[in-house]
Amino acid sequence: MGSDRWKNIGGTPQMEDSAQEKTQRKGCGYILCTVLLSVAVLLAVTVTGAVLFMNHYHAPSTEPPPVITTNMEDPNALVTIERADSSHINIFIDPNCPDPFPRLDGLQSALLSALADHDSEQKVAGGKERVLLTSLSDQVAQMVSQVARQRADWEIVKKVQNGLGAEIGALKNEQGRLIKLLSEGQSHVVQLGSSVSEVLETVQRELGSGRPRLKADLQRAPSRNSRPRGCANGSKPRDCYDIYMSGQQEDGVYSVFPIHYPSGFQVFCDMTTDGGGWTVFQRREDGSVNFFQGWEQYRDGFGKLTGEHWLGLQRIHLLTMQTHYQLRIDLEDFENATAYALYNTFGVGLFSVNPEEDGYPITVSDYTGTAGDSLGKHSGMKFTTKDMDNDHSENNCASFYHGAWWYRNCHTSNLNGQYLTGHHASYADGIEWSSWTGWQYSLKFTEMKIRPQREEN
């Protein structure tokens, strides 16, 4: 009994030790299952997150996304992932662990719901992108249509501009033709006037009241030492030639009384050059008078008769309207060389009812002399000043060349230009007579004067 008791006593600890070992082994198993289950869940979440990350950030692919499902065929597999190439990834759990499927079903449902939401968001985003692309496409179409309309409008404007250019060209051609016709008409009028004058002179000679008899009577007038202002028979002189024929044959200032201006005005008479009897209407000699004047000054005259002066366009017109006049221009350079130009036909505003409105056009022809013809090309032109542009140039020739003259486009002579001393660097803006000294030499002395055409006895 003692022995049995010993066995019992000794055996009891062994039985208690065996139960304790079972309990420890069972606790370790639960811990191990829990750890494995946690690892499996974490692995499933990680794989699912990786798949979602790849679906969200990677470029679009034609391959279908992996399919995540529970494996009904293998009860030990927690999750099965099927790839596009039909391969599978199974996540297993220990069969000795407690049943985790109720919790895993919830996790699976949540994962599938997240995937569905992600797909829905992608579909919504894709729909928005399609709407945006459609809107952009419509806007681009509208812009293309607008550009097409603008191009069509531009083509229309271009055609209109081309048409206007052609019309302007035609108008310019017509203007040139009209100017040519007017010039030819003026020449014909001048010729007609000359013919009429010749007829009148013929009639005068036939009636016995011609100028030759008057000249013979005047040549028997008082001697040149006497200085009465007027003709010997008491009639008023019309110009310096009448004064000369009355016996007053010294240079100086005299009064003349044109037919259409009986109150008269004073002029300077050149009684020595080429037989005398010249009425001076322009002189340049020292630059003391500014000839860059306006229209009114050139119409009425300025300066001093005994020095530099311009008699005035209106007075020149009144003188040359009386009979046929010739023009003499005397020139001198700074080397004291001299030359002259003689025009047997000269007049200002000969065929004008209102010469000022017509611009006091010049008529000049029949050149002889030593200076060359630098005025003939100006015949028929109106007078231009810095404030009255009557020339054919786009610019005002008077302003451009600092003078006043019967400019065309622009000049071959400029006797009312700046008083410069001989050669100058500027172009054609001095006292120029191009046929004698060119366009860059300003003359020292000029004198323009008129006298009735001389008649043979």
UniProtKB/Swiss-Prot annotation:
PROSITE patterns: FIBRINOGEN_C_1, FIBRINOGEN_C_2. It is a single-pass type II membrane protein. GO terms for molecular function: chitin binding; metal ion binding. SUPFAM superfamilies: Fibrinogen C-terminal domain-like. GO terms for cellular component: collagen-containing extracellular matrix; extracellular space; membrane. The record marks 401, 411, 427-428 as: Implicated in ligand binding. Residues 55-457 are extracellular. Residues 231-454 form the Fibrinogen C-terminal domain. Its main location: membrane. Residues 1-33 are cytoplasmic. Disulfide bonds join 240-269, 397-410. It holds the Pfam family Fibrinogen_C. The keyword Disulfide bond applies. Ca(2+) binds at residues 389, 391. Homotetramer; disulfide-linked. PANTHER family: FIBRINOGEN C DOMAIN-CONTAINING PROTEIN 1 (PTHR19143:SF45), FIBRINOGEN/TENASCIN/ANGIOPOEITIN (PTHR19143). Acetyl group-binding receptor which shows a calcium-dependent binding to acetylated structures such as chitin, some N-acetylated carbohydrates, and amino acids. This is Fibrinogen C domain-containing protein 1-A. The lineage of its organism: Eukaryota, Metazoa, Chordata, Craniata, Vertebrata.
